[in-house]
Amino acid sequence: MIWVWGGAAVAVVVILVAVLFTLSGSPAKKTSSDGLVTTFLPGEFQTVPTVCNSVTSATLGQYLPGKLHMVAPHSLDGSAQSLCNWTLDTPPLYRVLEVTAQAYAPSGLATGDGSATFAATDAYQQALQAKRHPAKGTHLPAAAVTSLPGLGTTAFAALQVIVTRPDATDLETVVARDHNVVVTVVFQGPHDHTARYGPVSPALLQAGAAAAARNVLSQLH
C-alpha cells in the first residue's frame, strides 16, 4: 500500500501473516480418528467483534487527534474476520492505523492437535518470524521486536523504519493472541520532519497500537 505526503510516495508493504481457515457451520466430532481436534474448544471464539466499532473514540482521539477518514475493507472470512483502517491527514499530523482481527478454526494443517488455538498460535509465530526476518521480496528491514506482557495471551510489538529517500516512515506493528484469535495492529507515521508533516514518536505509535489491540480483545465473547 502507498501513502503519499510532501510530494513523495512512501511504499509500505505490510505483511499481515494470517492463514484464513474456512469455518464450517455443520456439526463436527470433537476429534478425528487420528486424534486431531475438529471442533471449537471451550474458551475459543468462532467470531470476532466489528473492529471499526471496537476501537474506542477515546483511543482514536488520543492517538489520532483530528478529522479521520475511516475505511472498512471487506472480510474474506465472514464474521471470523474484521478489518478497519483510519487515516489522519491534518498537517502537521499524518498517521495511519490499520486493525485486523481473525478467529482461527481447527485445521489439520496446524501444529499440535490441530485445534483452533494451535492454528492461531502458528499464525502468531509466523507473524513474529516475518518481522524478525522479513522475506527478501518485501524490501522491509528487520524489526526491533519487544514483548508486551498483559496484552491477551501473548503479544509483541515490532518497529520498522522504512526509508524512501528523502522521507522515512516509522511502522509499528502489534500482534496479540487470545486463545484462537489474533489481532494485528499497524500504526505508522513520519519518522522525520517533512515539508508538511512532523515526526511521530515510536513510543506513541506502540502505545496507540497496543491500545487499539486491547480495545478489540476486550470485546471478544
Enumerate the predicted regions with their spans:
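Generic detector of intrinsically disordered, low-complexity, polar/charged segments
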Residues: 3-4, 22, 32, 149
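A small/polar (G/S/T-enriched), proline-flanked helix-loop surface module common
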Residues: 27-221
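Intrinsically disordered, low-complexity Pro/Gly-rich regions
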Residues: 1-9, 18-20
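Hydrophobic single-pass membrane-insertion segments
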Residues: 18-30
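N-terminal leader/presequence regions that precede the main folded/catalytic core
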Residues: 11-13
